[in-house]
Amino acid sequence: MVAMSIEERLQRLEDRAAIDDLNVRYFLAADGDDMTAVAECFTSDASFSSSGHVGGQGRQGIADFIADARKNMGLTIHTPHYGLYEFGDAGQASGIVGAHLELVLAGQATYGAIRYVDCYRFEGGDWRIAARDMRTIYIGEWAKCAEVFASATPVQWPGIAPLPSDYPRRS
């Protein structure tokens, strides 16, 4: 590991805090249906995927994708729990953000856990998301949360056939 100066270490801490703030801004904007603020969280050439399937590209494409998905949603709460970040070249970072979701989807209360696998870039004076892949650990009907979590197919989005977790248990 390369030794860092005090100034570099301080900058790293400030960058980590800025990326944490970015993720909270994204969650609050999404929950508040503020697609302008959602778009500002991303780089101009960003991509957003779900389990590896690209849903939106570019700021406006991502905002449109999320707005379209939210047409079938009621109240939502995204709650981040942790962020683990690695810094590469100047202005580049990658990370994993763990979160729980409470969503009303198609009139059904759902609960689950996800991880966002992200790439970040410093652009326009701020850290922004350059790539985000939402990977689902489990999600299902709130009333059946324990049953869904213990299932071999714990990814149970309403209206979609149950799937295995993006993070299956290793045996």
Where are these regions (language model features)?
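Acidic/histidine-enriched, glycine/proline-rich intrinsically disordered or flexible terminal extensions
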Residues: 140-171
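Short beta-strand edge/turn micro-motifs at domain boundaries
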Residues: 92-94, 115-147
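Extracellular/periplasmic carbohydrate-active domains that bind, remodel
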Residues: 6, 48, 71, 98-108, ...
